[in-house]
From Swiss-Prot:
Keywords: Ribonucleoprotein, Ribosomal protein. This is Small ribosomal subunit protein bS16. GO terms for cellular component: cytoplasm; small ribosomal subunit. Belongs to the bacterial ribosomal protein bS16 family.
Amino acid sequence: MATKIRLQRHGAKKRPFYQVVIADERSRRDGRFIENVGYYDPTKNPAVLKLNVEKVIAWLDKGAQPTDTVNQILKKEGILEKAAQAA
């Protein structure tokens, strides 16, 4: 089973916020997920990001692939470097 770390959209029309989840790559964007590891709210100024870093690193070690957007967020927060050092 190939897993992805991706954003799941929630919120009202034109007021989105996103949950960062671990999901099977075959499931729908807002469908079934394995684990919730945080949330991201880009509408706040500055954008709010709350992640369980230990869980994200553990899933990266297990082979979960972040989507392009999540990859950019993880790079910006320095989590990918922490995961590389832990490996």
